[in-house]
């Protein structure tokens, strides 16, 4: 039996490959990385260049294997064994695996694959092996799609491998919307852009005619909320990712709107509205235009973020005299403070898993990205810098991306990622200064 699932945006198709004599235990093999907060030794793995089934696939076969290896190595949980150490040379996707050769170089996981290309159509097949158990880890899979989507296919392979070995969801086949910046610090031009999670395939969504801030994906990834100063004052806008059609939301004379974020239903938007010197949190139904005020306080209340089930909102407020984090029911109600440490807290964002809240903290002249439980317990600071701010969660809720900016006139903003243990801090490779990242859900 073959199972197909069409992936409309990129024209990808997924199929199961059913090899002969796959052990029943292969679905639940012993190979497993247990993700904890302690120090771990990265799991050694090998990804030989995929087999090119025809001449037109040679370059793609090499490039796909490199992207897969980079995805896994970049997590800090895996360590690639370089090709120069390989004993076996994989020349056929269907050839038996020489487990002894891979054990000899201590490869605990092995990914093999093949690529065929015909015109604009590319087909990639792959299998994941638990080397020390002498068996496949799950069924083989096949992805098919256009040549322009080859990186997505590679990311999908890496997602499957990551998920099977760690038991956690992957996050490689995703995109990040961000603000691309240019010019001096005191006169920066800013425009919206999107990229693959690893910094590849940058595409610009707006020009630099007006300042844009705080983009946020919808739960389905097909729309983006953002704040623009196109009228001279901050206002929130909604953009369709496919057509780039844009419309204003919550427009009302004499007000400023900013810090928008979608509810999990994809229809409701929470945001801040400033009027007459007072800033409160509101919601807006993007279909009907119905607006509702959730807070009513003389303090500044902003940066709302929904819990994954949509029942609660975390936000920042200075109602206690300093900038702190609070949680309230999604329909409004009495908030409860969850941040209790020294310093100022802001930009809270709820993990897609629902277990943690990430935030920015300013304390003793330093900025930090941190996480805490939803009741405020177990606060952990993951980074420290002159300026770290604005965390966003990967789809699996185990990695954060944020903005880091250096001191002085020459300090340019850049995007960094870190896992929730604080171990794997990395700069996202971009050729332009960048800020305000927001991760998409996994692509369909």
Swiss-Prot record:
Q: What is its main location?
A: periplasm
Question: Does the keyword section mention DNA damage?
Answer: no
Identify the coding gene: tolB
Q: Where is the composition biased (Polar residues)?
A: 281-310
- Give the UniProt keywords, A-Z: Cell cycle, Cell division, Periplasm, Signal
Q: What is this protein called?
A: Tol-Pal system protein TolB
A Pfam family cross-referenced in the UniProt record is: TolB_N
- Can you tell me which family this protein belongs to? Belongs to the TolB family.
Record note on quaternary structure: The Tol-Pal system is composed of five core proteins: the inner membrane proteins TolA, TolQ and TolR, the periplasmic protein TolB and the outer membrane protein Pal. They form a network linking the inner and outer membranes and the peptidoglycan layer.
State the NCBIfam families in the record.
propeller_TolB (TIGR02800)
Question: Matching Gene3D superfamilies, A to Z?
Answer: TolB, C-terminal domain, TolB, N-terminal domain
């Amino acid at each position: 039996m073959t199972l197909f699932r069409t992936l409309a945006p990129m024209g990808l198709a997924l199929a199961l490959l059913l090899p002969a004599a796959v052990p029943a235990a292969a679905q639940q093999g012993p190979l497993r990385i247990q993700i904890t907060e302690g120090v771990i030794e990265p799991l050694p793995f090998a990804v030989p260049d995929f087999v090119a089934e025809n001449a037109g696939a040679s370059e793609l076969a090499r490039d796909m294997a490199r992207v897969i290896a980079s995805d896994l190595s970049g997590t800090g949980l895996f360590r690639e064994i370089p090709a120069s150490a390989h004993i076996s040379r994989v020349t056929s996707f269907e050839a038996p695996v020489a487990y002894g050769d891979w054990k000899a170089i201590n490869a605990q996981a092995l990914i093999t694959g093949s690529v065929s290309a015909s015109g604009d159509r590319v087909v990639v097949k792959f299998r994941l092996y638990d080397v020390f158990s002498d068996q496949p880890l799950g069924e083989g899979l096949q992805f098919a799609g256009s040549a322009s989507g080859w990186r997505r296919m590679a990311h999908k392979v890496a997602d499957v491998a990551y998920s099977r070995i760690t038991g956690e969801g992957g996050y490689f086949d995703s995109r990040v919307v961000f603000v691309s910046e240019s010019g001096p610090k005191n006169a920066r031009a800013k425009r919206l852009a999107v990229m693959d999670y690893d910094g590849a395939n940058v595409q610009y969504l707006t020009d630099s005619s007006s300042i844009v801030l705080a983009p946020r994906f919808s739960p389905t990834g097909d729309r983006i909320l953002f704040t623009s100063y196109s009228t001279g004052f901050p206002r929130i806008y909604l953009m369709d990712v496919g057509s780039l059609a844009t419309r204003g939301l919550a427009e009302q004379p004499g007000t400023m709107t900013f810090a928008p974020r979608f509810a999990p239903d994809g229809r409701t938007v929470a945001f801040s509205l400033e009027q007459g010197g007072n800033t409160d949190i509101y919601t807006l139904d993007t279909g009907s235009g119905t607006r509702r005020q959730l807070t009513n306080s003389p303090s500044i209340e902003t940066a709302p973020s929904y819990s994954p089930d949509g029942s609660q909102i975390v936000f920042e407020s200075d109602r206690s005299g300093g900038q702190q984090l609070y949680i309230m029911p999604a329909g409004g109600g009495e908030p409860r403070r969850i941040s209790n440490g020294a310093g100022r807290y802001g930009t809270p964002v709820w993990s897609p898993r629902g277990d943690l809240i990430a935030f920015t903290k300013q304390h003793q002249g330093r900025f930090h990205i941190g996480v805490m439980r939803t009741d405020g317990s177990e606060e952990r600071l993951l980074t420290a810098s002159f300026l770290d701010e604005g965390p966003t969660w990967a789809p699996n809720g185990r990695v954060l991306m944020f903005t880091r900016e250096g001191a002085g006139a020459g300090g340019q903003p850049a995007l960094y990622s870190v896992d929730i243990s604080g171990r794997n801090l990395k700069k996202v490779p971009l050729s332009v200064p960048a800020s305000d990242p927001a991760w998409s859900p996994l692509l369909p």
